[in-house]
């Protein structure tokens, strides 16, 4: 068995879930835990996680997370992390604070980049200049401005983060569940407490927790592990002897039946916006079978509106929606149920309703087919690992959790045996007993009631502005030629356009129904329909029965709308209603069968359908109100871009403020019979167009199977209809402000600009050379940047910004400042590498499938991509300065949209043509 000098082998084992082997090591001198995940994934990853346990609400570990990335002994520049963002090929580059740990992970497909990033990260966490430079603490944590107001990046971020009713409810619940341990504190920091943190305590906390024997290091992917381990040993770990004792978490005595009422202060308190959260403990972290069983059980009982427990609770009509939360990453995992859209009176009845519903389910027993469906879909998701976060980053986070709570970094990476065991227990009544045990204790209960706001009460080693000097800086030569599309096939079969993209692994089937020619005023209704579809009965099954079958046979399935601006002449907008299904290849026939029933046999009328429409509309309205507070910049950008782009105009109708207005109008009219008729009419018109494209991402054998299935399926037609561009008349530009609760602002400026890939270089320079310093470091906003979009729009934005008018003034000065700067060849190389590398970010199979289909509809060829890439890589300083000089005039034609506080909007009301309170 292979040995590594300087390390003691703990264990080495095969891991089919990771397609390779796991090796757990302990570093001899420092005591650091190390996990090696060796497989053939080219998207290599690194992560280092520390056990960080807050003892107050000052957010010290969140501030440290920001601070250590602000300069180190080897890299003594103010923002090495920022400079990495500008020039790295990383597919993931971040740091994150959890309630009990802080993790610093990255992923990159480039070997040289990996070495650079690993050294910068290690030097940052072990040798930060923040320990001798109080200015970092003041910038990232908190300080007082000349007028006495408190500011700071984390302080401002948390003002926005904790402004939402959900965040306040969650924090109150954590305090009630864990009154005596670290989990009861706000790890991100409460703005009311952050100014109590002194620099001296901040330094002490760092020295206590950022030690090598209090960390877990993960190396993942296809790489020379011996080389990386030797670097770790020689450059860092061998210089760090073990500390006297590691900090440890304490176990909370379980709180049973604790109750508390809390207010949520808002300018528009509504009687039906109360919430109630109930929480229970789910057992030991180390009992992974039990925790996986809880996940499966919650999916079966609460995963959809028709699931037994959720359906029973919704029938009580105590509120508009019920959410379920489950966190099995902490020392004492918990589950919670949250009733939303309730009155104060109905919120008080929620706990009794849950008890009654659980007892009813236990009396009948949980249907085995329902449990099997949830087990299957959960297992598929655990193997597929959907989403954009690289697998290696997920492994690094999971390794830190496993090491922290059990000493075994590999614990969470093994799941096959757990699923096999639970399959055996499914028929033994194990899940019924688990349900009984989970809900037996009285829950911790928090009721939140909206209330009008109260009246305010009357209370170093130098870092340079220089460039980051890496041992092996990347150049344009490191970029390679870019990934080419795998050749596929296209044919007309059974009245449908059939695309095949050869791929291994899971099978992905996408059905694209063309929406060109649809009336713009109908698109909001059609979008709502895609959400309602999961809730409707068919001619053969109830909605719950069909959902159970879909979960049994498919990894995932759903319907949604999307649109893209094509590269064809005239830049048409291609709008599609998409039905997507993922599965094991052997389930392809079942996918066609279930998809046919779901799409062609749905019932839109009757009490069941009308109740589903009302329920989903209410739930979607609540969800949007929550998102306005968290993602205001995205809604603002969509709203403003709708004046310049058909793609954005359609997106705004289906996902923006216009869609929110549509939902409010529906709920006010409450004519669900009429809505059902409208939905059925729209659905039939989409299907009758017969402009269907079927895209299969899978093996040749899967293609042969699909060719046999399509002609006899409901998708078949005599001939294929014509696909058309989606069009609508754009509205005249309007500067708008939308008032939200929260005390922070999301400021956006959007302008039209013909799409050119070279503009991505300018966007990176604007984002990281100008906005980062002036908006984030000086202005105190949590985020900012410039974005170029494929639909022919560009925009500047701020995120959780304490300022409004000042930020627009800063925006306006940017073009001239960038045009006046001098850029060296090294500068241009960094900008180009950073911009071009994003074109090659590794994608997971599901993402790759969606991207391939999008390119097909938009007419994007490998030749186009190569030409654009060449153009981007040839941008020189003169071209960049010319683009910057031209930007000012374009920005003057832009539209301002803000989601912000009442005070900030009123102070800058001359900037807006229209103001609305959401």
Question: What is each of the regions a protein language model found here?
Answer:
Residues 58-70, 523, 527-531:
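Active-site recognition of the HExxH zinc-binding catalytic motif
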Residues 1-45:
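Non-catalytic terminal extensions that flank enzyme cores
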Residues 203-235, 651-656, 675-709, 892:
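Non-catalytic, conformational "gating/processing" segments within enzyme and secreted inhibitor domains
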Residues 144, 149-212, 218-221, 225-233, ...:
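Hydrophobic, small-residue-rich alpha-helical packing segments that form membrane-like cores
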Residues 43-53, 79-127, 134-140, 167-192, ...:
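M16 family metallopeptidases and their MPP-like homologs
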Residues 874-918:
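In a subset of proteins, long, contiguous C-terminal domains/tails are tracked
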Residues 92, 203-207, 264-266, 309, ...:
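Generic recognition of flexible, low-complexity loop/linker segments
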Residues 37-40, 47-49, 155, 159, ...:
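His/Glu-based metal-binding/catalytic segments typifying zinc-dependent metallopeptidases
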């Amino acid at each position: 068995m292979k040995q590594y000098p300087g390390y003691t082998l703990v264990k080495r084992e095969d891991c089919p879930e990771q397609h390779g082997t796991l090796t757990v090591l302990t570093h001899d001198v420092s005591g650091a835990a190390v996990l090696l995940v060796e497989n053939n994934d080219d998207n290599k990853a690194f992560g280092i996680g520390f056990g960080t346990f807050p003892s107050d609400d000052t957010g010290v570990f969140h501030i440290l997370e920001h601070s250590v990335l602000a300069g180190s002994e080897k890299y003594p520049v103010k923002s090495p992390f920022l400079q990495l963002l500008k020039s790295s090929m990383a597919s993931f580059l971040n740091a994150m604070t959890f309630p009990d740990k802080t993790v610093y992970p990255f992923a990159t497909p480039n070997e040289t980049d990996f070495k650079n990033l690993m050294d910068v990260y290690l030097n940052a966490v072990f040798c930060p200049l923040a320990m001798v430079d109080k200015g970092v603490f003041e910038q990232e944590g908190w300080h007082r401005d000349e007028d006495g107001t408190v500011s700071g990046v984390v302080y401002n971020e948390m003002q926005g983060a904790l402004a939402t009713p959900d965040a306040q409810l969650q924090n109150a619940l954590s305090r009630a569940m864990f009154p005596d341990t670290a989990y009861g504190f706000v790890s991100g920091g409460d703005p009311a407490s952050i100014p109590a943190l002194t620099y001296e305590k901040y330094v002490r906390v760092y020295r206590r927790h950022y030690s090598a024997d209090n960390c877990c290091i993960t190396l993942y992917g296809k790489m020379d592990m011996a080389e990386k381990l030797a670097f770790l040993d020689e450059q860092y770990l061998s210089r760090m002897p073990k500390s006297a004792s590691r900090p440890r978490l304490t176990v909370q005595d379980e709180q049973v039946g604790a109750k508390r009422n809390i207010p949520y202060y808002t300018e528009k308190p509504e009687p039906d916006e109360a919430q109630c959260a109930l929480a229970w403990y789910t057992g030991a972290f180390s009992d992974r079978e039990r925790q996986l069983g809880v996940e499966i059980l919650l999916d079966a009982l609460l995963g959809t509106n028709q699931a037994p427990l959720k359906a029973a609770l919704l029938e009580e009509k105590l509120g508009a929606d019920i959410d379920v939360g489950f966190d099995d990453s902490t020392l004492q995992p918990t589950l919670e149920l949250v009733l939303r859209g309730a009155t104060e009176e109905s919120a008080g009845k929620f706990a009794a309703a849950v008890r009654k519903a659980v007892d009813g389910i236990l009396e009948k027993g949980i249907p085995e087919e329902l449990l099997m469906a949830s087990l299957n879909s959960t297992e598929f998701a655990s193997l597929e690992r959907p989403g954009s976060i690289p697998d290696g980053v997920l492994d690094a986070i999971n390794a830190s959790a496993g090491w922290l709570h059990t000493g075994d970094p590999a614990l969470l990476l093994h799941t096959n045996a757990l699923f096999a065991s639970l399959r055996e227990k499914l028929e033994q009544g194990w899940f019924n007993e688990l349900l009984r045990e989970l809900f037996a204790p009285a829950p911790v209960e928090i009721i939140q009631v909206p209330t009008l706001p109260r009246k305010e009460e009357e209370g170093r080693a130098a870092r340079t502005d220089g460039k980051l000097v890496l041992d092996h800086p990347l150049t344009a030569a490191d970029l390679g030629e870019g990934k080419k599309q795998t050749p596929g096939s296209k044919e007309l079969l059974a009245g449908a356009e059939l695309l095949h993209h050869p791929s291994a692994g899971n099978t992905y089937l996408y059905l694209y129904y063309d929406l060109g020619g649809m009336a713009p005023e109908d698109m909001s209704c059609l979008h709502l329909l895609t959400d309602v579809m999961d809730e409707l009965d068919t001619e053969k099954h109830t909605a719950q029965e069909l959902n159970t079958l879909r979960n049994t046979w498919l990894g995932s399935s759903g319907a949604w709308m999307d649109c893209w601006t094509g590269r064809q002449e005239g830049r048409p907008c291609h709008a599609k209603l998409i039905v997507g299904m993922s599965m094991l290849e052997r389930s392809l026939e079942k996918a066609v069968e279930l998809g046919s029933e779901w799409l062609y046999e749905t019932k839109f009328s009757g009490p069941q359908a009308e109740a589903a429409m009302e329920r989903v509309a209410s739930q979607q309205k609540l969800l949007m109100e929550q998102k306005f507070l968290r993602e205001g910049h995205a809604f603002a950008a969509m709203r403003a871009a709708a004046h310049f782009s058909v793609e954005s105009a359609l997106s705004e109708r289906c996902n923006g403020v216009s869609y929110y207005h549509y939902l409010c109008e529906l709920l006010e009219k409450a004519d669900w019979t009429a809505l059902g008729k409208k939905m059925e009419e729209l659905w039939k018109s989409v299907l009758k167009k017969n402009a269907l494209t079927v895209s299969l991402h899978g093996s040749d054998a899967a293609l042969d199977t699909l060719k046999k299935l399509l002609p006899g399926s409901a998708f078949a037609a005599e001939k294929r209809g014509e696909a058309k561009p989606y069009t609508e008349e754009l509205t005249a530009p309007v500067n708008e402000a939308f008032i939200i609760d929260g005390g922070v602002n999301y400021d956006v400026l959007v302008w039209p600009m013909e799409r050119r890939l070279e503009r991505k270089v300018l966007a990176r320079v604007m984002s990281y050379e100008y906005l980062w310093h002036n908006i984030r470091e000086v202005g105190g906003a949590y985020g900012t940047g410039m974005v170029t979009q494929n639909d022919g729009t560009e925009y500047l934005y701020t995120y959780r910004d304490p300022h409004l008018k000042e930020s627009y003034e800063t925006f306006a000065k940017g073009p001239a400042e960038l045009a006046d700067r001098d850029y060296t060849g090294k500068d241009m190389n960094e900008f180009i590498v950073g911009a071009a590398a994003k074109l090659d970010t590794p994608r997971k199979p599901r993402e790759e499938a969606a991207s391939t289909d999008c390119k097909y509809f938009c007419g994007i060829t490998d030749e186009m991509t190569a030409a654009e890439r060449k153009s981007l890589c040839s941008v020189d300083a003169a071209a960049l300065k010319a683009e910057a000089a031209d930007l000012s005039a374009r920005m003057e034609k832009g539209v301002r949209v803000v989601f912000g506080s009442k005070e900030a909007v009123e102070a800058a009301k001359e900037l807006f043509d229209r103001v609305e309170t959401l």
